[in-house]
UniProtKB/Swiss-Prot annotation:
This is Small ribosomal subunit protein uS19c. The gene is rps19. Protein S19 forms a complex with S13 that binds strongly to the 16S ribosomal RNA. It holds the Pfam family Ribosomal_S19. GO terms for molecular function: rRNA binding; structural constituent of ribosome. HAMAP family: Ribosomal_uS19. GO terms for cellular component: chloroplast; mitochondrial small ribosomal subunit. It comes from the Eukaryota. The keyword Cell membrane does not apply. Its main location: plastid. Gene3D superfamilies: 30s Ribosomal Protein S19, Chain A. Keywords: Chloroplast, Plastid, Ribonucleoprotein, Ribosomal protein, RNA-binding, rRNA-binding. Belongs to the universal ribosomal protein uS19 family.
Length: 92
């Protein structure tokens, strides 16, 4: 079920404060966050946000096409190692 329009998008308070401070100063620094559930809003465009994937922070450069999506969508948590080439058990 989608979030109510009346409530507006969820963005972590600490993330909003950091972005507003950088926008006021006109700086472009990497912002480190663990908030994967935060929605990307237009004020984040042009910033690089390092999103935690459970092991490390992956840098995500925010563009205008990303607005409305969650930060966690751009930092995958699982690594795909590939299928085994000669797996005789699965062929039976």
């Amino acid at each position: 079920m989608a979030r109510s329009i009346k409530k507006g998008p969820f963005v972590a308070d600490h993330l909003i404060k950091k972005i507003e401070n950088l926008n006021a100063k006109g700086e472009k620094k990497v912002i480190i966050t663990w908030s994967r559930a935060s929605t990307i809003v237009p004020m984040m465009i042009g910033h690089t946000i390092a999103v935690h994937n459970g092991r490390e922070h992956l840098p995500v450069f925010v563009t205008d096409r990303m607005v409305g999506q969650k930060l966690g969508e751009f930092s995958p948590t699982r690594t795909f190692r590939g299928h085994v080439k000669s797996d005789k058990k699965s062929r039976r």
